[in-house]
Amino acid sequence: TILAQVPAILAYYHRYRTGQAIIRPDKNLSIAENFLYMLNGQRPTPTMAKAMDVCLVLHADHGLNNSTFSARSVMSTQSDMYSAITAAIGSLKGPLHGGANEGVMVMLNQIPTVEAAEKYVLDKLAKKEKIMGFGHRVYKAYDPRATHLQVLAKKLAEDTGNADLYAKSKRIEDVMANAVAAKGIYPNVDFYSATTYHSIGLPLD
């Protein structure tokens, strides 16, 4: 089915656009392991594979979000599965949905040091600009998915030499906790998934 083929298609496309050899799937690997293997060219560590699995489950098993609604809306017209998945991906790409973790990585890359994170956040808040990865239309408390991803993000950052990214993320969270937690604004699933994805080798786009 197309759902089973999508990870391979994405990995093939990434290898092609970066001028690297295409890697065939290994039937002995799980879906998460195969995706990372075909994408990066090396077998993922158990922690990386677990992180990919956890991310897939946390994002998929979460009720009727915008991209799920988009897919179901298309299917309700008796359209085809390809059109429904295309609609869902189009919705997911938006910066207020799945594209938010890309925005988090852009933000982290703009902050030169851990020490600079506080000023960056406070300046943004003073201008009433959004801090990516915070706030949720349903959760007015800490997103339970972010709790799981924070643990994985820290472990992966330590294992892959990205400790500075995690440290900046944690500092941003601490500053935001002091500034806006009373308003019900907490990290959402996209905040720590950004550093998690970076550490397991997923490209920014």
Question: Model-found features: residue ranges?
Answer:
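Non-transmembrane, aqueous-exposed alpha-helical and coiled segments at domain scale
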Residues: 1-205
